[in-house]
Amino acid sequence: LSSSAASDVYKRQDVPLSMLFGELPLEKKVVQEEKNVFNVEQKIAIDADNDLDISELDPKAKESVKKHIEKSAENVLSHPTVGSKSFLITIGDRSVGGMVARDQFVGKWQVPTSNYAMSLRSFDDVCGEVISIGERPALSIHNAAASMRMAVAEAVTNMMSVPIESISSIRASANWMAACGENIEDLNLRKGVEALSNFCIDLGIAIPVGKDSLSMRTTWEKDQSNFTVKSPMTGIISAMAPVKDVRTSITTEYKNLEDPCLVLVKPNNFFRLNGSIYQDIFETSFTDTPDISSEELLNLFNFIQSGINKKNIHALHDISDGGILTTLSELCFTNKIGCSISLDNNFQVSPEQFLFSEEIGVVIQINESKLKELKQSAHSQNLIFQYLGKIGGSNFDILDKNKDKLFSRDIAELEQAWSQVSYRIKSIRDNKDDAKSEFDLISKTSNTGLFANDSFKQPKKGLKILNLLKNKPKVAILREQGVNGQNEMAAAFIKAGFEAHDIHMQDLLEQKKDLNQFNGLAVCGGFSYG
């Protein structure tokens, strides 16, 4: 429809709500501001004077920092929220949809580190849609409004790897969960909804749909005592945007560059730890909660989109659960190659804050020759642009100001820690020996990942020798109940030069069709036949 025609349709359909639903009773709710008070025992024994420069510490103190970071890294990577979710992915059939342009797995080793999902609109086009999710429920315990802004920001940074016309072309669905009926829970929901509305209005992101579950609490009685468990106010943002060309997207897989390096890009210089996995592991109380403004997110979005469109950014991974240490680790796992990161910068925060804070940001792979140009562009948009280090080797190394190793682990060991929970679940659910074999494959250097091994001779003249374009052999695509993939099969044959025909079993039983009419037969399998 043209804009004028669409406007006429909208006007004709624009009726007052009272015409559809009658006079709705509007209940007035009064909620009072309360201050959350947390009395949690401090269990952190490390204090590096809130400074990344620990080079001046005495050897004993420095060794204590090293041990703490190593322990923290393993605990964070093996946390169920952070760890590999392959047990959820491999149980499903990933081959059904022929228009899936990007699923969870990335690279030749098929590691589940994709930031987004992407689909094609047809078998013959390169345009499609990108989908991502954002959620930060742990933050709402401390700051409900910030949790919703961060959820939107996470959804946006997850789809930043895909060129999108503008941030306003993003549409989202909001899924609300809360334990309403109590003052503080009602207040948090009000704050969350209001913050989300204002934030998305500023960005131009529309939220036309959503759902809610507002009785997220369970109660029980035991030994004459009453117990209650409540869900914190949670908003899950599912975002989607149209994509003109899915081939222009980048992933967590590195490109083969002349002089590659890794760079941190952040919209602000905060490294707050409230609501982080690090806080959860050590049961520690922090005062400041991560947050972001609409202007900061828009600046980051525009910078990354420009860098991808100009082919200056070649790989990207966002910072989310687990912090930048997890982001860098997952890049290492995806590419089976290590990195050497330097903490020599001016952030004035402790190593723990830098490595485990879950503030919004991204790590990008660029050519070192583009450092100056991109840094100037980032600074012009009020962004933090920090060189991190080089790619290479088989270890993940973190160096201090004097280039001494603050942290050094083999990436295969780290990936096994990251995959531990998924492996344990597979061992219970699936064949135990198969799960163990898959887990052990992580540490095998002989594992080359996916590769094509053509064991047949291809004709020198290709498919032209078959003269398919002129004669177009007819192939019957047979289907029945429970069949899936017949459309994809037909599309593949058509692409190869065949003439595909849709044949149902009922057509054969009723003798409406005869297989003698066709030059070939393709039978697609289905779930109904086990």
Please name every model-derived segment.
Residues L1-A6, Y10:
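Single conserved hydrophobic/aromatic residue that forms the stacking wall/gate
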Residues S7-D8, F87-G98, S169-M177, P208-Q224, ...:
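A glycine-rich phosphate-binding loop feature that marks nucleotide/adenosyl-phosphate handling sites
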Residues Q13-L52, F396-A452:
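Short, low-order "capping/linker" segments at domain edges
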Residues L20, N39, E74-N268, S276-F286, ...:
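Glycine-rich phosphate/pyrophosphate-binding loop regions near the starts of catalytic domains
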Residues T287, D291-I360:
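Active-site-proximal betaalpha loop/short-helix elements
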Residues V363-K372:
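Helix N-cap motif at beta-to-alpha junctions
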Residues S377-Y387, K495-E499:
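A common structural junction motif
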Residues L406-G530:
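N-terminal beta1-alpha1 cap of cysteine-dependent amidohydrolase-like domains
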